A protein has these predicted regions:
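Helix-loop-helix hairpin linking two adjacent transmembrane segments in secondary transporters
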Residues: 94-98, 126-183, 213-216, 226-233, ...
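Paired small-residue
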Residues: 11, 82, 86-89, 94-106, ...
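Intracellular juxtamembrane helix-capping segments at the cytosolic ends
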Residues: 113-125, 310-326
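Conserved MFS/SLC helix-loop-helix module at the cytosolic interface between two early adjacent transmembrane helices
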Residues: 58-94
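Helix-to-loop junctions at the C-terminal end of transmembrane segments
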Residues: 60-72, 257-268, 357
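Cytoplasmic helix-loop-helix junction between adjacent transmembrane helices
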Residues: 102-140
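Helix-breaking motifs and short loop linkers at transmembrane-helix boundaries and internal kinks
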Residues: 39, 71, 92-98, 109, ...
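A late C-terminal transmembrane helix in Major Facilitator Superfamily
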Residues: 322-359
């Protein structure tokens, strides 16, 4: 595939990834508006977040099965088409339960999208730059965190939350058209079955990949889920500064994601993860020590964003290579479990973080974040450097 066409295809995937990211993260910023519109409590409206995450975990492995025999291009078109319609449903719905249903459908599509897009990005990328291709695709997700969510929150609070989901529908439709025009037709899928999911879980090297993903991705969320409390009550920032600090965190997350992709192409996924995991553990521990210094906590949170998102591309690459090596006949199934593992890590880490916060206080959350990533570090230290 020509370099120019390759870049266009990857950026089409990045735009799709951006739409997925905004859809996942936006509800938290407009939750009061949604609750007021549907006349439900905020905890009830919060199910729009929970049900989406459940959809991602379930959708990644299970929906890979019916889509797997199709060409990658058509997999993406079906995926984006349903995702767009789910967001349009939320934009025009006046029924909370219909919106809840649309959210779980969108979550299903989110989960399976990153299975398809990870493979597609690696296939269309220039030889030797496969991981950078994956990193650029994933950057849509991190850009959504930095720009899409703040802008979406502003739009939702100004014009109503329906406007946000209408914009997501429009952007996803543009991504659909871009994929239809640009994505090559030669990216063939491989049929998969439920039994392949079970078999993948029985392969020790892949099981190690999933544990690494859960711990590496989850670690930061032991702290991040409750970061506002740390900044307000320990570091004593003004409430207006929270958005600025999280913006800086997101910018560093984008940089970390791109650097992680480049590092993986140069050093391999295992060596990259060793570097990133050591960085994560050190930074998490330093946040506890620096929590009372506003300057140092900002610096360390920026580094936290860098290392937290720096691990995404090597995690995806490690699993993709391992799946191709150990389960060549059902690669998609093995990769789909790893996509679910990302959200398992987030959910588990948030749960652990909540217990630590309630029992010991927020200042201990960074320490437990460091502990959370240690199993992943130990596994990578004992693994071959050749992957």
């Amino acid at each position: 595939m020509k370099q120019n066409s390759s870049n266009k295809a990857i950026f089409a995937l990045a735009l799709s990834s951006f739409c997925m990211g905004v859809t996942e993260f936006i509800v938290a910023g407009i939750l009061p508006d949604i609750a007021k519109y549907f006349q439900v409590t905020q905890p009830t409206a919060g199910w729009l977040v929970t049900i989406y995450a459940i959809g991602v975990v379930i959708g990644a492995p299970l929906l890979s099965i019916p889509l797997s025999p199709l060409n990658r291009k058509y997999q993406l078109l079906i995926n984006l088409g349903i995702f767009a319609l789910a967001n349009l449903t939320i934009a025009i719905s006046s029924n909370f339960y219909l919106s809840l249903f649309a959210r779980v459908v969108a979550g299903f599509m989110h989960g399976v999208f990153f299975v398809i897009a990870t493979i597609a990005a690696a296939k269309v990328a220039k030889k030797g730059k496969e991981t950078q291709g994956i990193a650029i695709m994933v950057s849509g997700l991190t850009i959504a965190l930095v720009t899409g969510v703040p802008l979406g929150t502003f739009v939702g609070q100004t014009f109503g939350f329906q406007a946000v989901f209408l914009l997501i529908f429009i952007l996803t439709s543009i991504a659909f058209i871009a994929v239809f025009i640009i994505m090559p037709n030669h990216l063939h899928g491989s049929a998969t079955k439920i039994k392949y999911l079970i078999l993948a879980l029985k392969v020790p090297p892949l099981l190690k990949c999933y544990i690494i993903t859960i711990c590496t991705c989850g670690g930061g969320f032991v702290l991040y889920t409750y970061i506002a409390d740390l900044l307000l009550n320990i570091s004593h920032f003004d409430k207006k500064m929270i958005g600025v600090i999280l913006f800086l965190y997101g910018v560093c997350a984008i940089i970390g994601n791109l650097v992680g992709g480049r590092l993986t192409d140069l050093k391999g996924s295992i060596m990259s993860l060793r570097i990133i995991l050591v960085g994560q553990a050190i930074i998490y521990a330093l946040i506890t020590l620096s929590a009372y210094s506003q300057t140092m906590v900002i610096i360390n949170l920026c580094l936290m964003g860098f290392f937290a998102f720096g691990g995404i591309s090597p995690l995806k690459t490690l699993t993709m290579i391992s799946a191709q090596k150990y389960t060549p006949n059902f690669t998609d199934s093995s990769i789909s479990i790893n996509e679910g593992a990302f959200n398992v890590g987030i959910a588990l880490a948030s749960f652990v973080g909540g217990i630590v916060f309630a029992r010991l206080g927020i200042v201990f959350n960074p320490i437990f974040a460091a502990i959370f990533v240690l199993p992943a570090l130990l596994i990578t230290l004992k693994s071959s450097r050749t992957i």
